């Protein structure tokens, strides 16, 4: 608990206020002993011990080669049946050897331990080497051993984890600690996403009190959704700056989100409400920008999909449960009640975040460790890899890359263009439900405002069905297949989506043409459930496929995808009601169902031609 408080924003504030006298790190305590791997290297450097050259390490290299041979023999990922042939891996290693900034002796030490390699790769985006290494380490338990720091060719000593089971490494945290952090992130995500649609129950109240048109009354929802699509373009790259990290971004923006919830619930003019709702969405968006990255910090490749299922479920169910949470209360207490509920939900989450949410970013953790070791030893050669990388990094360059790169890739890469278009359509259709449900269930079936909110629980049921299907696929097929055959081509992750992509079209047409008085209300509700469950599976598959195929640009692509999805959803909220009013529910929903056919064609095209598209793309990993 002390470690969590120390790493949390409140703990860092206490340390700053007391000049690091409270909540000390191990390196700051009197009883701390510098690991022998560091002291030996520092002492050797002081006595100017020559670094072994490639010519006098022939025996060491032979031992390393033997170790690699034993590793390959026992590893399904590095065997002849794996993704890459041994000769290909050796060629790649030889090529990297010529460009490596590390000394030969240091590379020999590194090669003796898969865990040693892991600690450096955790700070990198997804690459083929990292994916294979993550899977390898998840499949085999290795004994605890000290990690030898690398020395660069210019004399810097790279600060790393002290041992392979270093408790400071988020991947080594206990299951309980990782579950706690994951729960906080999921609740945070749920609150922010619920804050979008929880307002829909208040639209009729605004229309009556301020004399608004229905399309105007939907603007506070659409601007909120647009804002949390814009936010990731800024918050995602900002949290990747090593000196900042993720936790400060979470805490500072959640503080503003919580504070803004108070004037939002009390504002007395429509223009002010629009501005405040936009700011709410903008400052709530880091959960959308960084939630998946936080899960990736803590979980290995094989376990990450399960963590992402939980996080995506929180985001998926939030908007659906918003009308349920506010529907009955708004009817009894007035339209402002839904906005007060956002404050009541956000406040406790913010307190937990600021007091107990630790930093998970490996570059940030190691950067701060390097600073402490420099202060302890007085040796400025002790640096983290992120500090070296950060020298070439500016906030403007990072933001420009995050904004420009997704646009460039979308126009130049057909696969990403399809993914962005399809997810935008799916997301827009999802948010159009908040405009069509009030035209169906109260009008055709006499439901009250509160009961319309209850209907939205079908999305929750759909999500549970989607979770069951996707987790069964992971548990019974994907993970065993990786353990047996290694990582297959990226398109193999799309197999569940090939079946699920028919669901959105079927569900929409079923809803559109059964939503009438002569047919029981359960029929259109089943259609929405089919839509929701199938969309959940499709989105999971797509969001795994993108970082596997485009590892170097995964963060930028997700930020761009978030913006496009939210922009389309913003528009769908505004055009949804006019569409359904003028065409009728059946024809209006059929238009959306027709658009969803793009997903069927595109998904099969991506599965068949994906490898060829990646081979031609300068952005993808083939």
Each language-model region and where it sits:
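Extracytoplasmic
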Residues: 14, 23, 177-214, 219, ...
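Intrinsically disordered, low-complexity terminal tails of fungal membrane proteins
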Residues: 1-177, 357-401, 478-490, 614-622
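Pair of pore-lining "gating" transmembrane helices in MFS-fold secondary transporters
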Residues: 175-196, 412-430, 529-533
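Cytoplasmic helix-loop-helix junction between adjacent transmembrane helices
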Residues: 276-315
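C-terminal transmembrane bundle
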Residues: 193, 205, 222-225, 229, ...
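Helix-breaking motifs and short loop linkers at transmembrane-helix boundaries and internal kinks
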Residues: 195, 210-211, 234, 243-244, ...
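Helix-loop-helix hairpin linking two adjacent transmembrane segments in secondary transporters
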Residues: 315-364
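Conserved MFS/SLC helix-loop-helix module at the cytosolic interface between two early adjacent transmembrane helices
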Residues: 230-271
